[in-house]
Swiss-Prot record:
This is Sodium/nucleoside cotransporter 1. Keywords: Cell membrane, Glycoprotein, Membrane, Symport, Transmembrane, Transmembrane helix, Transport. One of its GO terms (molecular function) is purine nucleoside transmembrane transporter activity. Residues 1-75, 124-142, 191-196, 279-289, 356-361, 442-452, 554-564 are cytoplasmic. Residues 100-104, 163-173, 218-256, 314-332, 382-418, 475-529, 588-658 are extracellular. It is found in: Cell membrane; Apical cell membrane.
Length: 658
């Protein structure tokens, strides 16, 4: 009884005082002294352990409350931080523009683009449903039909009037227009199903190409914008020298082609991989694809692949729609292949720019080729099957699989090595084969007393009429025809390298004709040639395309083989029609050189301006036997005309220099 009472007293005492009571006293007589000492020791031990924990909780209590407050108002803090960052950027942006607007032009353009994208996003988010309700009356089928007819009629009349007024000043542009008609008729004659051609798709594609070319080539704002964009791309690609010079040395980078141009492919591949990881490439591709799909009424998959070919190569673009390749119709496969042959990739674009090819023309040709490729592919191989991808919802593009930006950059650079090796190997092989073919043809020609027979000469004769229909002057046609033939039978790298050599000769002030041989082509011919060569349509690309697509869908190898030749031919014609559009729209740009002022000063180096001005002076100079020569036009009564003539005769040979 006493023991039970003692246990009860112990339990009550412990419960009432708690384990934090360090002076716990056990008064029950039933508990011996040893148990008492053990309990005292335990009580002191527990008290020593618990007191610091209690103080720690009291110290952490304000931090806990602060963390809870931050979590509760996280969205508010994010908005405040974002607002402060925007204010700081606005201050920096205004300061940069006020100090030197020309220097801050790139920042201004980027800022405007970001603001435009954000405005479109918020308009769609907050006003999208209202705009849809406002446009609901236009869903009436009869109203839409009348709108289409009026739009088509106005467009046709406007085109006819514009051509009539514009070609009155430059009749040679009509040749390029006739070239477009010629290529369209040839492609229609080669069509797989003539009765199934959707002319709406064809005319929309050609119309979009023409409108974009009009904005970029003819209008001053568009031309200046793309010229500026091309300059920025060149400046950006110049940073490749920092890496390649460190690894390879300045001497190799400056003097050797392989170390000068090929590292740009690695740098550009790295940048494209980063942009793909961030989702920027997918976003731009989807917007372009949506626009083409809505206007041209093509399916989601083929349109997405066509839009992707503006930025990536003919083997990378099908990866965007890889899960859907197995279900594509033959017409859709043909469209995917055609777009690959008709455009170039972003990485190769950088290499061509490093050759000295005009960057704005290359960018314009790539973008203009997308709607034209889609249109002509539907002309040559119209749709007769039922596609599974007619929905306007489109196809979702995945983000990059890399875990961070550094991995994306590393993978992009590593993947570009294979492309660099492929380009270098092809250049070595094709140039060697071309040299052998030329030697063999020259030997065969000499057997029958035909001197100088080469592959380029044969191409210059066979392709000369076609090149003339693009709008190239007849005197430039042999050289342009050579490059077109080289591009188709070898590859575009060799052709663009040849074009860059002609351009360098012109800019260096070399005489146009030497011993009856033309040394360079006109600026107009350079632009048309740049457009006509912009694409992967060559014989070697057949194997690359078939190999890439067959690895993705092996069971459709026979279908791929059926349409690849048609796609190659169609892709070539896309580039030729783009060249015709450039021939229609091209006008000389830049202020003409004031030759009187230019030659009034002493000059020691030859340039294109030197050649043009000296040629003008030669044309206005007349020999008077033993008397000093006389001058006409702007050179008449100029005291320095004789000195300028002497300077020009020091650089160029002419009959008036005798």
């Amino acid at each position: 009884m006493e023991k039970a009472s003692g246990r009860k007293s112990l339990a009550l005492s412990t419960a009432e005082n708690g384990i934090e009571n360090a002076g716990l006293e056990l008064t029950e007589e039933g508990i011996n002294s040893e148990q008492t000492r053990r309990m005292e020791v335990q009580g002191h031990s527990l008290s020593d352990d618990v007191r610091p924990a209690t103080h720690q909780r009291s110290y952490l209590q304000p931090l806990t409350k602060a963390r809870t407050f931050c979590q509760r108002h996280a969205s508010l803090f994010k908005k405040i931080l974002l607002g402060l960052l925007c204010l700081a950027y606005a201050a920096y942006f205004l300061a940069a523009c006020i100090l030197d607007f020309q220097r801050a032009l790139a920042l201004f353009v980027i800022t405007c683009l970001v603001i435009l994208v954000l405005l479109l996003h918020f308009l769609k988010k907050f006003l999208g449903k209202k705009l849809t309700r406002c446009l609901k009356p236009f869903k009436n089928s009869q109203l839409r039909l009348w709108i289409k007819r009026v739009f088509a009629g106005v467009s046709l009349v406007g085109l006819i009037l514009w051509l009539a007024l514009d070609t009155a000043q430059r009749p040679e542009q009509l040749i390029s227009f006739a070239g477009i008609c010629m290529f369209v008729l040839i492609l229609f004659a080669c069509s797989k199903h003539h009765s199934a051609v959707s002319w709406r798709t064809v005319f929309w594609g050609l119309g979009l190409q023409f409108v974009f070319g009009l904005l970029v080539i003819r209008t001053d704002p568009g031309f200046i914008a793309f010229q500026w964009l091309g300059d920025q791309v060149q400046i950006f690609l110049a940073y490749t020298v920092a890496g390649s010079s460190f690894v390879l040395g300045d001497t190799l980078v400056n003097d050797v082609f392989a170390f000068q141009s090929l590292p740009i492919i690695i740098f550009f591949g790295c940048v494209m991989s980063i942009l793909y990881y961030l989702g920027l490439v997918q976003w731009v591709v989807q917007k372009i694809a949506w626009f083409l799909q809505v206007t041209m009424r093509t399916t989601a998959t083929e349109t997405l692949a066509v839009a992707g070919n503006i930025f990536v190569g003919m083997t990378e673009a099908p990866l965007l729609i890889r899960p859907y390749l197995a279900d594509l119709t033959l017409s859709e496969i043909h469209a995917v292949m055609t777009s690959g042959f008709a455009t170039i990739s972003g990485t190769v674009l950088g290499a061509f720019i490093s050759f000295g090819i005009d960057a704005s023309s290359l960018i314009s040709a790539s973008v203009m080729g997308a709607p034209c490729a889609l249109a002509l592919s539907k002309l040559v191989y119209p749709e007769e099957e039922e596609s599974k991808f007619k929905s306007k919802e489109g196809v979702k593009l995945p983000r990059g699989k890399e875990s961070n930006v550094l991995e994306a950059a590393s993978n992009g650079a590593t993947d570009a090595i294979a492309l660099v090796a492929n380009v270098a190997a092809n250049l070595v092989a094709f140039l060697a084969v071309l040299a052998f073919i030329n030697a063999a043809l020259s030997w065969l020609g000499e057997l029958v007393d035909i001197q100088g027979l080469t592959f380029q000469v044969i191409c210059s004769y066979i392709l000369r009429p076609m090149v003339y229909m693009m709008g190239v002057e007849w005197t430039d046609c042999p050289m342009v025809a050579e490059m077109v033939g080289i591009k188709f039978f070898t590859n575009e790298f060799v052709a663009y390298q040849q074009l860059s050599q002609y351009k360098k000769k012109r800019l260096s002030g070399m005489e146009e004709w030497i011993d009856g041989q033309k040394q360079w082509i006109s600026v107009r011919a350079e632009v048309i040639t740049t457009f006509s060569l912009c694409g992967f349509a060559n014989l070697s690309s057949i194997g690359i395309t078939l190999g890439g697509l067959t690895s993705m869908v092996p069971h459709r190898k026979s279908d791929l083989s059926k349409v690849v030749i048609r796609a190659l031919f169609t892709g070539s014609c896309v580039s030729f029609i783009s060249a015709c559009v450039a021939g229609i729209l091209y006008v000389p740009r830049g202020a003409e050189t004031d030759c009187v002022s230019f030659l009034s000063t002493s000059f020691t180096n030859r340039s294109y301006e030197t050649y043009v001005c000296c040629r003008e002076l030669f044309q206005n100079t007349y020999l008077n036997g033993t008397n000093p020569p006389s001058f006409s036009g702007a050179w008449e009564d100029k005291a320095f005309s004789a000195m300028a003539l002497a300077n020009c005769c020091g650089f160029y040979n002419n009959t008036v220099c005798a």
